[in-house]
């Protein structure tokens, strides 16, 4: 289709999008065939530039504040018109995709991008259905115009770029953002607002399925191990980041994966390594003179990424969904070295730790966080993406856990034997052994030891894991120092939890002083 002197490229194939991206100088090919691009000064999400339009459907339903920022409806209309006119004056790319693999819960999306590579990214991450919108639902529009420059005083934005969600108009406006992760997370936020109304829990988690049909969920913030641990050659991958849990089903919202690449190795992450080939996109990965990716080079960012479609994963759930989960795992990266490698949680503890979302920002995906590592609490293990009040999601989680009798575990992928800089981080093979024990059912009804202060129950034995690693206190040379660190962590938990209005039983399920 042609508009004036420019072309609108609609539903191009992967090969065609790669060809267009190369011809337009948007990227280069790595020796694996993956398209390599740079995203400029933004190499992660920009939370301060994310807004939701305030209108009757959102006014009283959203937890407004520094995460969910209000944007006026009239300003949105004016800015959308400006961005659309700018985009229509040049070549651009349109693809029709779905968000949500379950037939009852998919959103049909018209994705318009200024660049070929961001359209390819969307084709990697969203679902490319055999038939678009068979149920004839109202269509969402994503308008992603990377080279538009917002004017804050005129447009009402915070900077030269923005991500604005308009639920009333079913529109997502992304302007001035070359980091493509904004697009996938914007549609995740849309589903996170809509799904609870259908009694479906939206989750920032990975999911895989065993030979017997048993499903495991992996909740966690970026860098805690969701993508790595769910990419298991002995199981079938459902997805690595965004899922919905309804009665009888866990379904992927996406059609691809978005893996962190820092220190990626074929030995530790063979599934991801093999997926980075023709049709994949590498963001901010440095190539050597032979076009070989150097995943140890963080000169552009610690948040280098690979986007690839699920078709690049040999062992995957063809239906992109599974049954309800036998095991629910909360991944936390504990910088203090206080938490054990695995704890078995009851329902109240599950609610407490889900609401707390304790972890560390590791090579953070957010702009402005730098390369440093710091502890954080992120409600629902994904606070930036959940627009409703946190309690609504926690109630749905408990309802789902109770309904299916899912077992819940807290798994520490962070430090032991001392805090960051003193102790050592649990190795990926150790954590994989913990996960394997959970999935085998070995920890169901296991004999446990109670850890005071942090108020957790630890199995006394885990197949494949050294027994001395299980109780973190035994790993510290200075036991008094451990006790002080545990009290310090407990204080952080208690202080953070004051903002939640929940039952006394849930409050009592957390660390106690």
Swiss-Prot record:
Coiled coil: none
GO cellular component, one term: cytosol
One record GO biological process: gluconeogenesis
Manner of cofactor binding, per the entry note: Binds 1 Mn(2+) ion per subunit.
Function, as annotated: Involved in the gluconeogenesis. Catalyzes the conversion of oxaloacetate (OAA) to phosphoenolpyruvate (PEP) through direct phosphoryl transfer between the nucleoside triphosphate and OAA.
Assembly notes: Monomer.
Name this protein carries in UniProt: Phosphoenolpyruvate carboxykinase (ATP)
Gene that encodes the chain: pckA
């Amino acid at each position: 289709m042609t508009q004036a002197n420019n072309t609108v490229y609609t539903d191009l194939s992967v090969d065609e999008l790669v060809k267009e991206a190369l011809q337009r100088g948007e990227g280069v090919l790595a020796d694996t065939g993956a398209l390599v691009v740079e995203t400029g000064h933004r190499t992660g999400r920009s939370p301060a530039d994310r807004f939701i339009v305030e209108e009757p459907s959102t006014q009283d339903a959203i937890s407004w504040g520094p995460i969910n920022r209000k944007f006026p409806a009239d300003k949105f209309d004016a800015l959308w018109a400006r961005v659309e006119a700018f985009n229509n004056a040049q070549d651009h790319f349109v693809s029709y995709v779905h968000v949500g693999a379950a037939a009852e819960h998919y959103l049909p999306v018209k994705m318009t991008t200024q660049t070929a590579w961001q359209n390819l990214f969307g084709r990697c991450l969203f679902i490319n259905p055999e038939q678009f919108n068979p149920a004839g639902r109202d269509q969402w529009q994503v308008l992603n115009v990377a080279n538009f420059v917002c004017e804050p005083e005129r447009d009402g934005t915070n900077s030269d770029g923005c991500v604005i969600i308009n639920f009333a108009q079913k529109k997502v406006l992304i302007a001035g953002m070359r980091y493509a992760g904004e697009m996938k997370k914007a549609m995740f936020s849309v589903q996170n607002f809509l799904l609870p109304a259908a009694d479906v829990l939206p989750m920032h988690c990975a999911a895989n399925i065993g030979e017997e049909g048993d499903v495991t969920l992996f909740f966690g913030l970026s860098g805690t191990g969701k993508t790595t641990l769910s990419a298991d050659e002995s199981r079938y991958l459902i997805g690595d980041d965004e899922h919905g849990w309804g009665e009888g089903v866990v379904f992927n919202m996406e059609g691809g994966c978005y893996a962190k690449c820092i220190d990626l190795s074929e030995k530790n992450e063979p599934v991801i390594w093999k997926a980075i080939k023709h049709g994949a996109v590498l963001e901010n990965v440095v190539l050597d003179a032979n076009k070989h990716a150097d995943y140890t080079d963080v000169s552009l960012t610690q948040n280098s990424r690979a986007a690839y479609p699920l078709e690049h994963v040999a062992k995957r759930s063809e239906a992109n969904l599974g049954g309800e989960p036998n095991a629910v795992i909360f991944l936390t990266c504990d910088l203090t070295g206080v938490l054990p490698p695995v704890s078995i949680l009851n329902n109240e503890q599950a609610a407490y730790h889900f609401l707390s979302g304790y972890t560390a920002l590791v090579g953070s995906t957010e702009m402005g966080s730098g390369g440093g590592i710091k502890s954080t609490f992120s409600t629902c293990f994904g606070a930036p993406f959940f627009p409703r009040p946190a309690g609504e999601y926690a109630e749905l989680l408990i309802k789902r856990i109770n309904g299916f009798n899912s077992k819940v575990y807290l798994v520490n992928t962070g430090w032991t034997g001392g805090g960051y800089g003193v102790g050592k981080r649990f190795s990926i093979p150790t954590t994989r052994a913990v996960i394997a024990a959970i999935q085998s059912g070995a920890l169901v009804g296991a004999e446990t030891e109670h850890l005071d202060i942090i108020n957790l129950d630890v199995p006394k034995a885990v197949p494949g894991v050294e027994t001395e690693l299980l109780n973190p206190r035994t790993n510290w040379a200075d036991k008094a120092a451990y006790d002080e660190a545990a009290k310090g962590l407990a204080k952080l938990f208690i202080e953070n939890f004051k903002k939640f209005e929940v039952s006394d039983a849930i409050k009592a399920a957390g660390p106690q002083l």
